[in-house]
């Protein structure tokens, strides 16, 4: 997936911008307050339907204008598709391929941008949930099976946890183990493959920039030498005691 064309109107300080982009690398250079960050923000908005800087649409609309528009052309193994976003003080309108779309997920399925900003250090400083979100967004970008697998896993996890919290017979929770284990193993495999793709590049960056050996390792959330179904069964009594599932990809 590559953004190869971009049009921005009345977004932040940008009055009207039209760019043809390289599918792989683009470098934006300019003076302070010239609009570089606003341009990146517009690209992010095109793929996420939101900003990484603010939740208030009126702050993104250029002063004196009623709305902003962002249109981009995305290519991926074919002629490509046009994505569009219109933001007003009343809300956001999304179009995919010229047709109205229901949610920002329709944008992300074609163009899921990832941003590395000054807060990237929080990936190391904060808990594992932030790292899981960062990792999962990357997997979603390259693995088409990821989203349905992720949804299937979390649907089963919610049902199992609900059964555990209500304190009924163990069979009410165990009935979800097969679905949870199947989706969990598949989800972990997708994550693991993505980490394997990233690891060589990260190691090279560590050597060249820091002079250090850097390794990227994925800990999947249960014993490495054990199937998830076995771990779920072994931990059932603890799960019933605390009303939650303690092993699985959600604990990675």
Predicted regions and their residues:
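Conserved NTPase motor "head" modules and their coupling/switch loops across ABC/AAA+ ATPases, GTPases
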Residues: 1-31, 45, 52, 57, ...
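Juxtamembrane helix-loop transition sites at the ends of transmembrane segments
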Residues: 31-33, 148
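Conserved lysine of the Walker
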Residues: 36
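Nucleotide-state sensing region of NTPase/ATPase domains
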Residues: 44-130, 135-146, 196-204, 229-240
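Long, charged N-terminal accessory/stalk domains
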Residues: 122-123, 129-174, 178
């Amino acid at each position: 997936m590559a953004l190869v064309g971009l049009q921005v109107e009345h977004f932040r300080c940008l009055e009207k911008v039209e760019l043809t982009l390289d599918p792989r690398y683009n470098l934006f250079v300019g003076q302070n307050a010239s609009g570089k960050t606003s341009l990146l923000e517009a690209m992010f908005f095109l793929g996420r339907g939101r900003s990484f800087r603010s939740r208030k649409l009126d702050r993104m609309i250029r002063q004196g204008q009623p709305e902003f528009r962002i249109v981009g052309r995305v290519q991926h193994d074919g002629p490509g598709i046009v994505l569009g976003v219109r933001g007003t003080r009343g809300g956001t309108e999304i179009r995919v391929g010229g047709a109205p779309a229901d949610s920002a997920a329709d944008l992300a399925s074609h163009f899921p941008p990832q941003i590395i900003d000054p807060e990237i250090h929080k990936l190391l400083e904060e808990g594992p949930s932030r790292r899981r979100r960062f990792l999962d967004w990357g997997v979603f970008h390259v693995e088409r099976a990821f989203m349905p697998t992720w949804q299937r896993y979390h649907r089963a996890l919610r049902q199992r946890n609900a059964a555990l919290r209500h304190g009924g017979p163990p069979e009410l929770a165990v009935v979800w183990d097969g679905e949870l284990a199947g989706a969990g193993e598949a989800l972990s495999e997708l994550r693991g493959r993505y980490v394997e793709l990233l690891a060589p590049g990260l190691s090279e960056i560590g050597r060249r920039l820091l002079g250090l050996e850097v390794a990227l390792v994925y800990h999947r959330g249960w014993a490495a030498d054990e199937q998830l179904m076995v771990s779920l069964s072994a931990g059932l009594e603890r799960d019933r005691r605390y009303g939650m599932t303690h092993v699985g990809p959600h604990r990675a």
